[in-house]
């Protein structure tokens, strides 16, 4: 065999080995696990497009639902105008669909997954909120100690600790004192409200009196949990309570 064919064979195997190594050690999309060959970015082009779609809409700053800015009148939208809401305003990254939903589910099962991207989205939502300059404390929505022990961490606390603010501090003197059923297992708003009623409390010598507090959570569905948290914090003396969430689920206005 001449030298030229041997070189071609060597080149073929070398190229195949390089391709194999690239696939084996390649960066993967944090949502769908597709291989990403680009140097930067944590999402593939498809998941990135999905994320842009679900995070680009206008929303009501009172309830967080998808709504045109022209449908908001005197601070509320048609869906929340008659609702009793205890938090004063809300900021969100997007709606709980497609790649945003996938990243949040990954984040809830493994705190290392999607944390960087979700933290970036949360800080973007915070910077665009109506209450950025008012916050004294970030308060993560607490887990019951049994849930925290099983999971190993509170995803809301992980998120709160990555928020960028010149003055506000993260505080965990707001606790869950009663274990509740999963809100997603209940169909009606009434059931969800009843489920979380009296489930939260503040610790002795908490710092919330006269302060403005921002609750931090992953997903708002009916808002029952956030509402109960806000009610308890205001009963404890908080001057205002805001909410920051990664996503609002199934709440778009038709």
Q: Where would I find each of the regions flagged by the language model?
A:
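A short coil-to-beta-strand element that immediately follows conserved catalytic motifs
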Residues: 87, 137, 167-175
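PRPP/pyrophosphate-binding module of the type I phosphoribosyltransferase fold
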Residues: 2-17, 22-29, 171-254
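Arginine/glycine-rich "motif VI" loop of SF2 helicases in the C-terminal RecA-like domain
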Residues: 83-86, 165-166, 234-238
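ATP-binding/phosphotransfer module of carbohydrate and carboxylate kinases, centering on a glycine-rich
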Residues: 36, 128-133, 165, 251-253
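Short, well-ordered alpha-helices that flank and scaffold nucleotide-derived cofactor binding pockets
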Residues: 49, 124, 161-165, 227, ...
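Generic hydrophobic alpha-helical segments
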Residues: 47, 118, 122-126, 196-200
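Extended interfacial segments that mediate partner engagement and assembly in macromolecular machines
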Residues: 56-162, 189
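N-terminal juxtadomain amphipathic helix
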Residues: 2-99
């Amino acid at each position: 065999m001449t030298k030229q064919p041997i070189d071609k064979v060597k080149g073929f195997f070398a190229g195949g080995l390089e391709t194999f190594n690239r696939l084996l050690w390649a960066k993967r999309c944090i949502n769908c696990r597709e291989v990403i060959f680009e140097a930067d970015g944590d999402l593939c082009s498809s998941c990135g497009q999905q994320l842009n779609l679900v995070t680009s809409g206008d929303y009501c700053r009172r309830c967080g639902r998808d709504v045109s800015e022209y449908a908001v009148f005197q601070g509320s939208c048609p869906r929340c105008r008659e609702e009793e809401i205890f938090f004063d305003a809300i900021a969100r990254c997007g709606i709980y669909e497609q790649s945003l939903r996938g990243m949040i589910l990954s984040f809830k099962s493994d705190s290392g997954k999607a944390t960087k991207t979700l933290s970036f989205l949360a800080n973007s939502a915070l910077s665009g909120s109506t209450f950025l300059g008012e916050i004294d404390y970030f308060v993560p929505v607490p887990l019951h100690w049994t849930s925290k022990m099983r999971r190993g961490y509170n995803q809301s606390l992980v998120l709160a600790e990555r928020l960028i603010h010149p003055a506000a501090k993260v505080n965990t003197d707001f606790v869950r004192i009663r274990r509740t059923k999963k809100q997603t297992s209940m169909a009606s708003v009434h059931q969800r409200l009843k489920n979380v009623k009296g489930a939260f409390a503040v610790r002795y010598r908490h710092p919330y009196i006269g302060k403005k507090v921002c609750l931090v959570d992953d997903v708002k569905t009916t808002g029952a949990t956030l509402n109960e948290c806000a009610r308890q914090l205001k009963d404890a003396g908080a001057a205002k309570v805001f909410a920051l969430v990664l996503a609002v689920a199934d709440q778009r206005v038709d």
